[in-house]
């Protein structure tokens, strides 16, 4: 079961815990981007890069409690802890993975089966429900979940959760006007903000781009994540505020919203 901090599982609105707000190069300060989502008695993970099992352990969260994981894309900094997590669940309860769902973009089945083929009986006999979602929507807990391609890779997707509150997770993406339309009027937007304005990298956003994205999308609150060390500076909030006029949050790992 969850610890006292997470003992009440019925929430009026989704509760979000930042498991990782950085990148694979962030060192001990920030783990790669990942989030714990809690809503209406359900618990899910959104992305599972390296170090996320450690974060769950720090929070004393029973590995069997989450029922779902949402994957944005297949780069290792967003999904490498998934199979260790499935092994942990199997060792705790060898039938538990049959009650677990993995949602992700087109290509999820191939990615999963390729990795599972190297693991043997423990995984192949206790397979979770692997579900590809693209240009359609699903239901999780009391949330309608929609996805949209980001262009970061051929398969990468962003997620939009619609319950009592609309919440948008960009995953990895560059500045994308079509994605802004998909994110429009979310109360909370969680955007990647990888590199400084003076060193832009294709497929990622700078503070100026993330701030502009949030302003055009009309977010009431902006949470930035996926910050490389060179962009994780004291000036980051000022740079974002030059474009975005709403409530700005630069989180620390394990912050709760």
Task: Name each model-derived stretch.
Residues 56, 82-85, 112-115, 179, ...:
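Hydrophobic packing residues within well-ordered alpha-helices of enzyme cores
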Residues 51-101:
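Active-site metal-binding motif and surrounding structural segment of the metallo-beta-lactamase
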Residues 175-257:
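Cap/insert and terminal regions of metallo-dependent hydrolase folds
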Residues 9-59, 156-171, 188:
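Conserved beta-strand hairpin/beta-sheet module of binuclear metal-dependent hydrolase folds
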Residues 95-156, 163:
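Metallo-beta-lactamase
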Residues 49, 151, 174:
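Adenine-nucleotide cofactor-binding loop residues
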Residues 3-4:
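Ala/Thr-enriched low-complexity intrinsically disordered regions
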Residues 45-49, 67-73, 77, 81, ...:
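Active-site neighborhood of phospho(di)ester-bond hydrolases with catalytic His/Asp-centered motifs
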